[in-house]
């Protein structure tokens, strides 16, 4: 599957430019109001379960939607997903001038494994 290999390379390259944060640290920053968590999964994935207090902006539209929903380029934005999309989204936001962007390591699976809350 060469397409998957190229995708994995793209994700690996993005991760070199993006700071990763643990689910526990992401939860603490969300709960303190220090950060916004952005779920970059598609709406149908979001509807199946998501992090309470997170904002949904799919990977396909985040560049169009981000300024309307998070205008401050200095705000801490933590992207998460179910795979590598959060690293790609975080890198894209950095290129748009957002200065405090993170990708949550392990995505929603790691969040659930840490027994952090989800809702649907």
PLM feature spans:
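Rhodanese-like catalytic fold shared by cysteine-dependent sulfurtransferases
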Residues: 1-35, 43-78, 84-120
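N-terminal glycine-rich beta->alpha transition that marks the start or flank
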Residues: 39
